Design a protein with these regions (language model features):
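Short, flexible segments with low predicted structural confidence
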Residues: 4, 27, 99-101, 111, ...
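Non-cysteine beta-strand/loop elements that form the S-adenosyl-L-methionine
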Residues: 67-71, 93-102, 214-221
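N-terminal binding-site loop/beta-alpha segment at the start of enzyme catalytic domains
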Residues: 1-89, 163
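Short, charged beta->alpha transition segments
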Residues: 96-98, 119-131
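A short alpha-helix capping/helix-coil boundary motif
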Residues: 5-9, 35, 104-105, 135-138, ...
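Active-site mouth loops of central-metabolism enzymes
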Residues: 12-23, 107-122, 247-251
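Beta/alpha (TIM)-barrel catalytic core signal, keyed to glycine-rich beta->alpha loops juxtaposed to Asp/Glu
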Residues: 23, 30, 44-48, 125-137, ...
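Alpha-helical membrane-targeting segments
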Residues: 75-111
């Protein structure tokens, strides 16, 4: 991102509202910053609507230079904001209610897709700036339906967003197929993409790079960790080939996580890779993917090739 320098790893705050009290949330963000991870990804939808305010409160007294992405397009479901605070004490006392409680909490995390009306995007950006207590560095459309993403009204408000200083860069998150067409059609406002790139769902990031579009990728761990564990456990041949061609012991799950992040960083060398954790020690392990990498470029290429050659079906959760 030639106009903006952001850290190679970014910390996603989609689950921060459920990660404990404010002191713990502050510790997570502080751990990330101390480890050199200074880009943070939030949205009005994240944390049941609380993620932006939590991050803003934490960063208010932060002396370091950090960057922030926020979004427009998804909102938290319209349920009481203190649902989890009510449910958790009940969960502790009445174990038989656990299944019902989990369903209620999961429902509270379902997004409401925002129907666009003129002025909505700018109003959302203003609300985000108040919660964050700073302008966003990057402002993305958040998985918006195609008809809105390509409308003149939305494109016009994104232009206005940059003019008013609410964001340095604008872009869009979503599926690779949609992003390709939208970025080519409106490169001035869709100059940043956010999309999945993982072992199980690889993206052609070269297309965006050659088009002058910056990429922020996510779901590397979610789209790789379980699949690799499945192959190591249930397909002995995979482990044998891995040992011969990659030569790295990943029986330690923390090492496996670092390897997955290193692959994601290798495949998005000009961009940023997002991850998330509610454990400070895991954040430090993630940072090692940048500071003390375990893999060479040849090993990264070998992992992608090996996975594509051997992996034929998604993990069978019946095992």
């Amino acid at each position: 991102m030639s106009e903006l320098r952001i850290s190679r790893l970014g910390f996603g705050l989609s689950g921060i509202a459920g990660s404990g009290n404010f002191i713990h949330q502050q510790r997570l963000v502080r751990t990330a910053i101390d480890a050199g991870i200074t880009h943070f990804d939030v949205a009005p939808f994240y944390g049941s609507g609380d993620a932006e305010k939590i991050l803003g409160d934490i960063l208010r007294d932060c002396p370091e230079q950090v960057t922030v992405t926020t979004k427009f397009g998804l909102l938290p479901a319209k349920v009481p904001g203190k649902l989890r605070a009510i449910v958790r004490p009940v969960l502790r006392r009445v174990k038989g209610l656990k299944q019902l409680a989990v369903k209620l909490i999961n429902y509270s995390h379902r997004p409401d897709i925002q129907c666009f009306k003129p002025g909505d995007l700018l109003a959302s950006a203003e609300a985000s700036m108040r919660k964050l207590q700073r302008p966003a560095n990057i402002f993305l459309l958040h998985d918006m339906v195609r008809v809105h993403s390509e409308s003149e009204a939305v494109v016009g408000e994104l232009h206005q967003l940059k003019k008013t200083g609410y964001a340095a860069l604008t872009g869009i998150s979503g599926s690779e197929a949609d992003l390709r067409e939208l970025c080519l059609a409106h490169p001035a406002v869709y100059s940043v993409t956010q999309l999945e790139n993982s072992l199980s769902n690889p993206a052609d990031l070269g297309f965006f790079k050659s088009s002058g579009i910056s990429s922020i990728t996510h779901r590397a761990i979610m789209g790789g960790f379980e699949h690799l564990n499945f192959l190591f456990r249930f397909r002995p041949g995979f482990g044998q080939i891995w040992e011969r061609e990659i030569g790295l012991d990943v029986s330690n799950q923390d090492v496996l996580m670092q390897v997955i992040l290193e692959l994601a960083l290798f495949e998005n060398q000009a961009g940023t890779v997002l991850f998330s954790s509610t454990r400070p020690e895991r954040i430090k392990i993630a940072a090692a993917a940048v500071q003390k990498p375990l893999l060479t470029e040849v090993q990264c290429e070998g992992i992608r090739r090996l996975f594509q050659d051997v992996y034929q079906h998604p993990p069978d959760r019946r095992h």
